[in-house]
Design a protein with these regions (language model features):
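Metal/cofactor-centered catalytic core regions of large enzymes
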Residues: 1-166
Length: 166
């Protein structure tokens, strides 16, 4: 059997190198909270400002180990608060007679299907792409939060989030 050995002298990386508009991005709670704060999302601004006031810290403190940890908690609070709103909407739907919970469908194994998911999970941006042929998965691709944050330095010297924060 032919075995190919990794050429450690050449250029290689142990993780994908995604870019958005040619630039590396940071994803996750810190990025999510900072973007929402900058966009003046009222729910986020209220919780961030209260945290900073209670801790006696300036806004710049979110760009620290403490800030990263706080952003995880802040995001959890914002998500929980939004969950209460979703629960209230669900109860209102049920009371009005809307009890449908899913749309049933049948997969035709003679067809080809393509799908994708692009969304947000606790660690950050997540995307999946899938292609199914004759009931068999032919291709599955994922770009997970660590892929964005651990991306290596590129040819232009732009570092990923992990490298740049170290």
């Amino acid at each position: 059997a032919h075995t190919k050995v990794l050429d450690t002298q050449g250029k290689y990386t142990w993780i994908k190198a995604p870019r958005y508009d040619g630039k590396p991005l940071q994803v996750g709670p810190l990025a999510n909270i900072v973007v929402n704060y900058a966009k003046k999302n009222e729910r986020v601004v209220k919780v961030v400002d209260q945290f900073l006031k209670d801790a006696g810290l300036p806004l710049e403190a979110v760009f620290s180990t403490l800030g990263r940890t706080a952003c995880r908690m802040i995001e959890a609070k914002v998500v929980a608060d939004n969950g209460l709103i979703a629960l209230e909407n669900l109860i209102a739907n049920i009371k009005s007679g809307d009890t449908q919970t899913c749309a049933k469908y049948v997969i035709d194994n003679s067809k080809e299907y393509k799908g994708r998911y692009i969304g947000h999970v606790p660690r950050g941006a997540l995307s999946h792409w899938c292609r199914i042929e004759k009931g068999v998965i032919k291709n599955w691709q994922a770009v997970v939060p660590s892929t964005w944050n651990a991306t290596p330095k590129d040819k232009d010297g732009a570092m990923g989030a992990y490298e740049s924060c170290l």
